[in-house]
């Protein structure tokens, strides 16, 4: 009985940590999507060469927190403190150099075999140090508590903080730069940009009044959603929708049922945390007070096929964009092959 009572609370607390990974751009005005400029790089006379043959080390880069970091040599032992960064590292062909990850790094399959040194925001510093990493790739959730401790230990840490699809592309290139995989990163982001453009060329001219009102839900008790300055908001806009809370607040927040009713979303997109999407979906559609909300009345509540496609700011975000675009505009993009409703 005690475990059953604690489980919802623990899930909620875990989710609060998880949603800190999802952040991005616009608010009351439609966003513009000029490519994010690359992080400033101050070249230092090269002493070593990367695996792709470019004389890039040592280098100085600026991470997403504006920190100037010197990368003295080509990293050989990398620890990732975020599932999205783990996916980026593997996509760049660096799986063999990853020596530590988090409890939630489960993609690709090979990531599951890596030593675990952290939850979402609480790395085991002693275990991490035992792995002797020469590069740690962290996330903005680690800025206040974890980053200072790692810096005091003299560890080399870069921090990513995606707030739009453009900054996700930038983070791929940043990680590629510091690991000697700039060429591979450029190829990966070029492919991602093409897929994003394939969607936005069909949605960019849709006027605000023609965009369906979209509510994104990642937890149900209470309802957690995203405002502006999050990559989820940017993704919804690029997919041709309008995030109903974009002009109300930034980042993530719990909202009341009354607020949802007042916004009257025409489409509800549910991601969930891990495998909890079905639980959230059932809670939303069975909530009597929401029965007159347009999305529920019109049977337009959708559960993402894999929550990680939209929750993780990594290479698979383009798959999430494709899926959301089909939910919002099936008349343009077609109905998803295996629609989850």
Enumerate the language-model features and the residues they cover:
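Bacterial N-terminal signal peptides that target proteins for export
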Residues: 1-10
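Bacterial Sec-exported substrate-binding components of ABC uptake systems
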Residues: 5, 14, 21-84, 183-215, ...
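A short, structured surface patch at a secondary-structure boundary
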Residues: 58, 77-131, 135-142, 244, ...
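Extracytoplasmic substrate-binding proteins
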Residues: 67-68, 145-224, 245-247, 297-341
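His/Asp/Glu-enriched short active-site or ligand-binding loop at hydrolase and phosphoryl-transfer sites
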Residues: 102, 228-252, 272, 303
């Amino acid at each position: 009985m005690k475990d059953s009572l604690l489980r919802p609370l623990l899930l909620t607390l875990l989710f609060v940590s998880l949603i800190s990974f999802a952040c991005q751009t616009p608010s009351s005005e439609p966003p513009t999507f000029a490519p994010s400029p690359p992080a400033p790089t101050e070249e230092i006379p090269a002493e070593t060469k990367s695996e792709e043959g470019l004389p890039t080390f040592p280098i100085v880069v600026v991470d997403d927190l504006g920190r100037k970091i010197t990368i003295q040599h080509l990293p050989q032992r990398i620890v990732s403190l975020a599932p999205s960064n783990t996916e980026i590292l593997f996509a760049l062909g660096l799986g063999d150099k990853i020596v530590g990850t988090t409890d939630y790094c489960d993609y690709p399959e090979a990531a599951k075999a890596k030593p675990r040194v952290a939850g979402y925001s609480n790395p085991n510093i002693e275990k991490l140090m035992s792995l002797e990493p020469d590069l740690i790739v962290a996330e903005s959730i680690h800025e206040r508590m974890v980053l200072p401790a790692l810096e005091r230990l003299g560890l080399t840490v870069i921090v990513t903080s995606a707030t739009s699809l453009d900054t996700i592309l930038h983070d791929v290139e940043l990680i590629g730069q510091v690991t000697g995989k700039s060429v591979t990163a450029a190829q990966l982001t070029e492919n991602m940009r093409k897929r994003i453009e394939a969607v936005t060329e069909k949605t960019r001219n849709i006027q605000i009044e023609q965009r369906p009102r979209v509510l994104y839900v990642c937890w149900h008790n209470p309802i957690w959603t995203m405002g502006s300055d999050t990559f989820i908001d940017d993704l919804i806009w690029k997919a041709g929708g309008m995030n109903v809370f974009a002009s109300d607040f930034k980042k993530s927040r719990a909202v009341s049922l009354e607020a949802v009713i007042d916004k009257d979303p025409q489409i509800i997109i549910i991601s969930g945390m891990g495998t909890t999407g079905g639980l959230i979906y059932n809670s939303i559609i069975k909530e009597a007070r929401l029965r007159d909300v347009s999305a529920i009345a019109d049977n337009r509540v959708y559960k993402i096929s894999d929550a990680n496609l939209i929750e993780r700011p990594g290479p698979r975000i383009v798959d999430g964009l494709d899926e959301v675009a089909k939910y919002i505009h099936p008349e343009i993009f077609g109905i998803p092959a295996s629609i989850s409703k």
